[in-house]
Amino acid sequence: MGLCHGKPIEQQSKNLPISNEIEETPKNSSQKAKSSGFPFYSPSPLPSLFKTSPAVSSSSVSSTPLRIFKRPFPPPSPAKHIRALLARRHGSVKPNEASIPEGSECEVGLDKKFGFSKQFASHYEIDGEVGRGHFGYTCSAKGKKGSLKGQDVAVKVIPKSKMTTAIAIEDVRREVKILRALTGHKNLVQFYDAFEDDENVYIVMELCQGGELLDKILQRGGKYSEVDAKKVMIQILSVVAYCHLQGVVHRDLKPENFLFTTKDESSPLKAIDFGLSDYVRPDERLNDIVGSAYYVAPEVLHRTYGTEADMWSIGVIAYILLCGSRPFWARSESGIFRAVLKAEPNFEEAPWPSLSPDAVDFVKRLLNKDYRKRLTAAQALCHPWLVGSHELKIPSDMIIYKLVKVYIMSSSLRKSALAALAKTLTVPQLTYLQEQFNLLGPSKNGYISMQNYKTAILKSSTEATKDSRVLDFVHMISCLQYKKLDFEEFCASALSVYQLEAMETWEQHARRAYELYEKDGNRVIMIEELATELGLGPSVPVHVVLQDWIRHSDGKLSFLGFVRLLHGVSSRTLQKA
């Protein structure tokens, strides 16, 4: 549900014309759309949608035509199956879509007591309604006493009559917990308190009166200049990096969910609407399909995703900011979903050729369909497009913890290959790693231990870090028995091969690394020994799957084998090769 909307939803809907754009746009598959800023939950895409890619026309062009907008995006019409699933989630209809009588057995046994204060009426006086959605509405209000006396606030009102399933109740409980835990970041809407009575839950927050980011885009003629777009992206990335470090994924990032505090040009941007947010541990994946159709990541449609899904949404926002069009468009939801899965964003038409190469690269590295190759929020803040336009203050990045864990458990053969690759990194790439190394608090001698990882996270931990079980994951790393790392080995352990592979310079990196490996670490190795090094079991036909890893001329690791070794291997991946 939207928070602090600048104008009522009814007024917005009048400004949402039916698009008359042609239907030849690429299509894509399955995520839920939000009408007027509210969630729809979609089931997995029908297999029949993917027999052939509708993104490829007879001219074999697989890119999305430019879609310039001068008015707010027309929301896609919700498909019947999405409506049905959403209704079932909140208990408004049975699976066969028959109405559930008021007070039916579906609500028997549901505990709708949240433990919030019941003194809302004595603390706040409700003013006008500023937004309405499927499961509640948002009002402005004024504090009557206490620290907020006389202050304007926003109140999100969620009727308990809408909470007819345990899932719906848990969604509200989790939203309040996340807001309470994360409040305080300068780019996140300030949470004040939560109340309840017999009829409603009231979430009291900062009232943002500067309007939506979407409105600002439209006021500027549909797009931002590069300079102004950078300012917006830095604020978005800053708050998202903070959320991800705490183990929180927003799951509905879009221009409508970022508000300016005031109408002043220098007003800070605030992330709002955590109604779809959830906790996710670094080594776990979510599988429920939520979000808004234009901004949904491909892996969400495939029902296996993590914080990388937010980065895709940020990529869509960046694309819109810079060119004034959506990267994926179609007349229907299913068409949008097919475009997300199959089509490529258009970077050929104006204004892309006139934008800086760094700006184009920034967006491309966020809109990579392979989530493993996507930048994290902390990495994006270190991208050359943004470096220099803000004071470099990079937060800790959870991907470092994941990569180091894999590195420690890797074979000595792979570690030596990664060491060679680390020596090919450029200064901008090393800047990010140096920041992450410093955040871990190295000793005076320049070393970090596994305990440093836990200590660093604890410095910035919140209740959300505990609820997401991020601390459990970090504790696993801190308990690993491994020698101390200097910066050189840290770089080898913390670099992402997949992210390097997404760069245009990947081939040069790989070739140069192989040359270094040839000089320092390559040696004659038997297939059986290689299989042992890789930890492959007896069930793997090693002579079949590893034969092209070794050069027949001298028995040493081939370039192909070297690259595969960099990516890491398992019995499963080898058998698929």
From Swiss-Prot:
Binding site for Ca(2+) 4: D554, K556
Residue numbers with lipid attached (N-myristoyl glycine): G2
Positions of the UniProt region annotated as Calmodulin binding (CaMBD): 410-430
Binding site for Ca(2+) 2: K484, E489
Record-annotated EF-hand domain positions: 428-464, 465-500, 501-540, 543-572
Residues involved in Ca(2+) 1 binding: S443, N445, Y447
Chain residue ranges for the region called Autoinhibitory domain: 391-421
Residues found modified as Phosphoserine: S292, S334, S558
Known regulation of activity: Activated by calcium and calmodulin. Autophosphorylation may play an important role in the regulation of the kinase activity.
Keyword Plastid listed: no
Catalytic activity, reaction form: L-seryl-[protein] + ATP = O-phospho-L-seryl-[protein] + ADP + H(+); L-threonyl-[protein] + ATP = O-phospho-L-threonyl-[protein] + ADP + H(+)
Keyword Kinase on entry: yes
Span of domain Protein kinase: 124-386
Chain spans, region Disordered: 1-38
Membrane topology qualifier: Lipid-anchor
One Gene Ontology cellular component: membrane
Post-translational modification: Autophosphorylated.
Subcellular location: Membrane
GO molecular function: ATP binding; metal ion binding; protein serine kinase activity; protein serine/threonine kinase activity
EC number: 2.7.11.1
UniProt enzyme class: transferase
Residues that bind Ca(2+) 3: D520, N522, E529
The protein's assembly and partners: Binds calmodulin (CaM) in a calcium-dependent manner.
PANTHER family: SERINE/THREONINE-PROTEIN KINASE
Domain notes: There are 3 contiguous domains conserved in the CDPK subfamily: a kinase domain, an autoinhibitory (junction) domain and a calmodulin-like domain. The autoinhibitory domain (391-421) inactivates kinase activity under calcium-free conditions.
Protein name: CDPK-related kinase 7
Taxonomic source organism: Arabidopsis thaliana
Gene responsible for this protein: CRK7
